[in-house]
Amino acid sequence: MVQTPPTAAELGLMQGYPAPPDKRVTQENLLDPPNNRWAFQHMRELMATAEISRGNGPVHALPERRRDLSDLSFTAGDGTRRTVAEMLALSYADSLVVLHNGELIDEQYFNGMGPASQHQMMSVTKSFVGTLALQLASEGLIDEDALVIDYIPELVGSAWQDATVRHAIDMSTGIRFDEVYDFGEGDVARYGIASGFRPIPEGWSGPRNLEELLPQFLKEGNHGEMFHYVTPNTEVAGWIIARVTGKPVSQVISERIWSQLGMERDAYMIRDRIGMEMAGAGLNAAARDLARFGQLLLQDGEWHGQQVLAPEVGRASCRERV
């Protein structure tokens, strides 16, 4: 029997006024277990953020056909049989929302989270930014075959000097970057500090924002030859979106997606110290609203009779690229 992990409240995190020193969650320790049990539902209390407005339109309620999936079993990656309930407990999940044919089948919340909670989405953010880049390309606002530096001359001399926009979107750039999440002194640590996700350490002499960070990455290998998962590629895509629209990514998400789908809650993006938004990992949103976005892609960009995205964009977002 897998035990349900303790909640942030049961652990006493940020309880009391003020919370005891050993129960305080800060920007310095938010990633350290168990502090992330509290932090991932309270990111805007720890760092600068930008609002993603749902607008003033009505909520598009999800049709429901409820079924409890807790006892549904499957074979896990290690070959053991697990139930959905066991998987959720072992992964310290805060929520589960399942749609089938556009209907809400199951919805479960843990650790104090509920339908209105805005949760840190980490790299799910990339799906929104990539989709927007493809949509703007379909409208002729972005040329996927153009060089990145045609839009962002600040990146001349960097890894993106001779990379195309498509290389960045597809994460096929040849770049010297090690995506290892140790948050010590490596590339991801530098990215976390520059993006505003992590505080600036005492004595830090490195980049203090994304504008300073991105030009420092150098080329390694050839572009377009292989998939190389590099979060800064999505930061570049977000920068291009902001450059061609004249608006921050949060506003483009609001206008193009959030206000179009009848979302239940506003969302928000983490931003750095000069207002550049964390396009690679900065989204915080409610679980049902993430499900709505997924359904939009499955419906080839159509939502309640409105073509929110070009059909080819929805299809491309659900297709494996080789």
Annotated model-derived regions:
Residues 1-113, 142, 170, 174, ...:
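N-terminal leader/targeting segments and the immediately adjacent pre-domain N-terminus
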Residues 85-88, 134, 149, 166-169, ...:
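Non-transmembrane alpha-helical segments in soluble domains
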Residues 92, 120, 158-210, 214:
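Extended ligand-binding groove/face enriched in aromatic
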Residues 102, 120-145, 168, 237-241, ...:
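Active-site SXXK
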Residues 103-108, 147-150, 184-223, 248-266:
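Short, charged, amphipathic alpha-helices and their helix-cap/turn boundaries
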Residues 138-180, 216, 244-281, 285:
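Active-site helix/loop module of the DD-peptidase/beta-lactamase fold
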Residues 205-208, 212-218, 225-227, 245, ...:
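Penicillin-binding protein/beta-lactamase superfamily catalytic region
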